[in-house]
Amino acid sequence: MFNSTALVIFAILFLLISADAFPIPSPNGEIDAMLIRNSIIGEDEDLMPTEISRRVLMAQKRYIGYETLRRDMVPCQKPGASYYDCRSGQANSYSRGCDTITRCARDTNDINT
């Protein structure tokens, strides 16, 4: 009789100890995993705008060509020309039309203000 009682007590103690070592998955396990994932994704809110921009550019996988990265590359051989189209003439040539509102080099005495 003593051996059977000791065996039952030993079995109960073994089950209690093993319950801590091998947890039974709860139905909330999936919910907990989703909450952890959302908290990891939510960490992006604290990032600097430059870090967010860097991550967006990395995700788009757009690359700068090697020609662009060369130091000795001159976009336009004509001095003073615009780098965009290499046309002759100044890059920022000042030319403005003459409208009534600008009051440019003409008789503006007849304009009612």
From Swiss-Prot:
The record marks R54, R55 as: Required for proteolytic cleavage. Residues 22-58 form a propeptide. InterPro entries: RALF. It comes from Arabidopsis thaliana. PANTHER family: PROTEIN RALF-LIKE 31, RAPID ALKALINIZATION FACTOR-LIKE. This is Protein RALF-like 31. Cell signaling peptide that may regulate plant stress, growth, and development. Mediates a rapid alkalinization of extracellular space by mediating a transient increase in the cytoplasmic Ca(2+) concentration leading to a calcium-dependent signaling events through a cell surface receptor and a concomitant activation of some intracellular mitogen-activated protein kinases. Keywords: Disulfide bond, Hormone, Secreted, Signal. Residues 1-21 form the signal peptide. GO terms for molecular function: hormone activity. It comes from the Eukaryota. GO terms for biological process: calcium-mediated signaling; cell-cell signaling; regulation of growth. Belongs to the plant rapid alkalinization factor (RALF) family. The keyword Translocase does not apply. GO terms for cellular component: apoplast. Disulfide bonds join C76-C86, C98-C104. Transmembrane segments: none annotated. The keyword Isomerase does not apply. Coiled coil: none annotated. Proteolytically cleaved, probably by S1P, a subtilisin-like serine protease (subtilase). It is found in: Secreted.
